[in-house]
Amino acid sequence: MNKFIAALLIALLALVACTSDAASSEAELPEMDLDAFVARLESSAKPAVVNVWASWCLPCRDEAPLFTSAHAEYGDRIDFYGVAYNDNQPGARQFLAEFDLPFTHYFDFDGDALVRFGGIGVPRTYFFGPGGELANTVNGVLTEDTLTSNLEELLGS
């Protein structure tokens, strides 16, 4: 019985090691070039939502599925972006894989986006009108109603 448990433990450790290697070989999130990002927002005719999150943030994990759903419904009319803040690449990649967030994400370890757009802590969500004008900011976890009302406001509904 002890040999069976030892063999099972070795197999489990090997599986974990293989899984870790697979995750570390995935492409890293691109570092955020904040000036280029702001220029993209300012030159866009579409409104945008920027969600700042971290894989270690429990409220961020709570609201992540809302962004997947919102992107499915509004993604053709509103640009969605995610910014991983004060995180590490493996944690950020695992978070994205777990929640299947199907839009562009950037890595911002130092929190330059929070400084530039205003605010501290995560989660934090910025809503920009066409041309990059900041329309609203929500600090803390979003509810479905709050997210939907902000998205509808961006669209002028």
Segments the model singles out, each with a brief description of its role:
Residues 40-61, 67:
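Short active-site neighborhood of thiol/selenol oxidoreductases, capturing the structured segment around
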Residues 1-8:
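Bacterial N-terminal signal peptides that target proteins for export
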Residues 49-50, 80, 125:
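Hydrophobic beta-strand anchors of alpha/beta hydrolase catalytic cores
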Residues 18-22:
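Bacterial signal peptide processing site
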Residues 27-47:
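A short beta-strand-turn-helix
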Residues 95-101, 109-155:
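Thiol/disulfide oxidoreductase modules built on the thioredoxin-like
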Residues 13-17:
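C-terminal motif of bacterial Sec signal peptides marking the signal peptidase cleavage site
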Residues 61-99, 109-115:
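Structural microenvironment flanking redox-active thiols in thiol-disulfide oxidoreductases
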